[in-house]
Curated annotation (Swiss-Prot):
Catalytic reaction(s) noted: Endonucleolytic cleavage to 5'-phosphomonoester
Biological process terms in GO annotation: DNA replication, removal of RNA primer; mismatch repair
Cofactors named for this entry: Mn(2+); Mg(2+)
Taxonomic placement: Bacteria, Pseudomonadati, Pseudomonadota, Alphaproteobacteria, Hyphomicrobiales
Main location per the UniProt record: cytoplasm
Localization annotation: Cytoplasm
Record-given protein name: Ribonuclease HII
Naturally occurring in which organism (per UniProt): Rhodopseudomonas palustris (strain ATCC BAA-98 / CGA009)
Family, as annotated: Belongs to the RNase HII family.
Cofactor note: Manganese or magnesium. Binds 1 divalent metal ion per monomer in the absence of substrate. May bind a second metal ion after substrate binding.
GO molecular function, one term: RNA-DNA hybrid ribonuclease activity
Database matches in HAMAP family: RNase_HII_B (MF_00052_B)
């Protein structure tokens, strides 16, 4: 039991001696209870620690109850869907038609680059438009059909041979420019995804990340992606064993393994290192004649 250190401890006076002398009066001494004070100090320290812990816990709960600020959400970015706002601003100024264009297939080892241009109907802008990379295959297919049914659409393919000859950037810009000029009505303004403007017969505005900002570009990205995916499935029938229907020509391990086992096809791009190495092994060997599916323009006019 811990004593109360606030009250001093009194030592009783010594009794009178038996010799008959007068008993001396001894003043009671006050003894400082060192051991008791130490024990009490530990208790006080423990109490203070418990109190601090309780305060910290309360603060943590209060912080958790507050809504997280944008500054605290590191790495979390709220992505707003593409809008038709910039197109409407141009329409108010009397500028029409307005096209968006984008491409698909710059990075794969095989297959073409596919460019698409789209002029959306302001009264029938499909809901759910977004960058094709952020959509599921099922959602892309559904939007593809809706876009083709309500908008002006053109699709152009740049073959692997053109990519090998001109490089991937020039082939992509060539396809994008042709897609714009292949539209039923030549647009007065074009939004293109990326840094590079096109040499078109109308005003062209390059927008970095445009497929996630502008509805017309988002629609074009969906048309280009679905068109290319469908074509790669056709190539898979002509070139079995490569898995084009699965990876769409990208350099995944399964594709690299097939390339090492079977060698490259005419649909592979020579300037990629794995393809170049495979070509060196079979240089001079006869190549199978495969029907060319590229360099064709496909135009789908808007329905009434």
């Amino acid at each position: 039991m811990i004593r109360d250190t606030k009250q001093p401890i009194k030592v009783p006076a010594k009794p009178a001696s038996r010799s008959g002398g007068k008993a001396k009066t001894v003043k009671p001494k006050t003894v400082k209870p060192k051991a008791v004070k130490a024990a009490d100090g530990k208790a006080a320290s423990a109490k203070a620690s418990t109190s601090k812990a309780a305060v910290s816990k309360t603060s943590a709960k209060a912080a958790a109850a507050k809504p997280a600020s944008a500054k605290g959400l590191k790495g979390v970015i709220a992505m707003a869907p593409p809008s038709f706002r910039r197109e409407r601003a141009l329409i108010k100024r009397g500028i029409w038609p307005i096209a968006g264009c984008d491409e698909a297939g710059r990075g794969p080892l095989a297959g073409p680059v596919v460019a698409a241009a789209v002029v959306l109907d302001p009264k029938r802008v499909p809901k759910g438009l977004d960058d094709s990379k952020r959509l599921s295959a099922e959602k892309r297919e559904a939007l593809f059909e809706e876009i083709c049914a309500t908008a002006q659409v053109s699709v152009v393919y740049a073959s692997p041979e053109r990519i090998n000859r001109d490089n991937i950037l020039r082939a992509s810009l060539w396809a994008l420019t042709r897609a714009v000029h292949a539209l039923p009505d030549l647009p007065r303004h074009v939004f293109v995804d990326g840094r590079d403007r096109l040499a078109t017969q109308c005003d062209c505005e390059a927008v970095i990340g445009g497929d996630g900002l502008i509805a017309s570009i988002a629609a074009a990205s969906i048309i280009a992606k679905v068109s290319r995916d469908r074509l790669m499935c056709k190539l898979a029938e002509q070139c079995p064993g490569y898995g084009f229907e699965q990876h769409k020509g990208y350099g995944v391990p399964e594709h690299l393994d097939a390339l090492a086992r079977l060698g490259p096809t005419v649909h592979h791009r020579r300037f990629f290192a794995p393809v170049a190495a495979a070509w060196q092994k079979i240089e001079g060997a006869p190549q199978p004649q495969i029907r060319d599916l590229f360099e064709a323009d496909v135009t789908v006019e808007a329905t009434a």
